[in-house]
Amino acid sequence: MSSATQSARFSPSPISVEHLGTIGYVDAWDRQRELAAERAENVGTDTLLLLEHPAVYTAGRRTEPEDRPTDGTPVIDVDRGGKITWHGPGQLVGYPIVKLAEPVDVVRYVRRLEQALITVCTDLGIVCGRVDGRSGVWLPASFDNGQWLPERKVAAIGVRVQRGVALHGFSLNCNSVLTGFDAIIPCGIRDAGVTSLSRELGRDVTVEEVTPAVTAAVVAALDGELPVTEHDIERVTFDSAAAGTTSSAPTFTTVQYG
């Protein structure tokens, strides 16, 4: 059996799912740590927390001072990987508190989460995938109706593994108001943007609509029932100089990674 079809979890028991509704970040963080302490001692069950947060910025361990809000908005410093991000209404947040199979492979675990979210977005009709060297789920850059759209992230992932147990997780922008990202450098990436399911599909896509599909996909991915496949997006760049001097149309350079 290949690693792509093996469970990423130590326990064969089913994952428990808790729907917490809208909950403050610190309260949800406390719940994460409570569950993680139990799982580290082989007590309780692996649990997927699904929720929304009131608007809040959280900064991972690699956040640089220049990544932080330009308007002085407070930030909660957390112990996950990655840099700064925004959470808020209209964004589905998932925290799988899971004791990982041994030997612990954090990269493989992150790829499982990405696979689950790529599957959900693809089933909705969105062309998306991974970007080499960047976690999360991305849409390729494109030139649409005269407007250049850079690569943009629809789902972010940031995790921590402590005593063999994964904490933190993912966020999927459903019908979020994306202006919350304007005051920061999301995930510390300056040459890309953020987007939402609603923006890409041209209709209102709610947290309630996608929650069942996300739940099923995350559970299947972690249990090895949803194999990890290659989903690297096509990298497209816009050569503005060439567009302005040699042609009325933009020039694209495409590179396939993977």
From Swiss-Prot:
Gene Ontology cellular-component annotations: cytoplasm
Domain BPL/LPL catalytic, residue spans: 42-226
Subcellular localization: Cytoplasm
Catalytic activity: octanoyl-[ACP] + L-lysyl-[protein] = N(6)-octanoyl-L-lysyl-[protein] + holo-[ACP] + H(+)
Predominant location: cytoplasm
SUPFAM superfamilies: Class II aaRS and biotin synthetases
Entry's Gene Ontology molecular function annotations: lipoyl(octanoyl) transferase activity
Enzyme Commission number, as recorded: 2.3.1.181
Pathway: Protein modification; protein lipoylation via endogenous pathway; protein N(6)-(lipoyl)lysine from octanoyl-[acyl-carrier-protein]: step 1/2
Keywords assigned: Acyltransferase, Cytoplasm, Transferase
PROSITE patterns in the cross-refs: BPL_LPL_CATALYTIC, LIPB
Gene3D superfamilies from the UniProt entry: Bira Bifunctional Protein, Domain 2 (3.30.930.10)
Keyword Cytoplasm on entry: yes
Superkingdom classification of source: Bacteria
Amino acids binding substrate: R80, G81, G82, K83, I84, T85, W86, H87, A156, I157, G158, G169, F170, S171
GO biological process, one term: protein modification process
One Pfam family here: LplA-B_cat
Active site: C187
Site (Lowers pKa of active site Cys): K153
Matching HAMAP family: LipB (MF_00013)
Further information: In the reaction, the free carboxyl group of octanoic acid is attached via an amide linkage to the epsilon-amino group of a specific lysine residue of lipoyl domains of lipoate-dependent enzymes.
Function: Catalyzes the transfer of endogenously produced octanoic acid from octanoyl-acyl-carrier-protein onto the lipoyl domains of lipoate-dependent enzymes. Lipoyl-ACP can also act as a substrate although octanoyl-ACP is likely to be the physiological substrate.
Family: Belongs to the LipB family.
UniProt name for this protein: Octanoyltransferase
Organism: Rhodococcus jostii (strain RHA1)
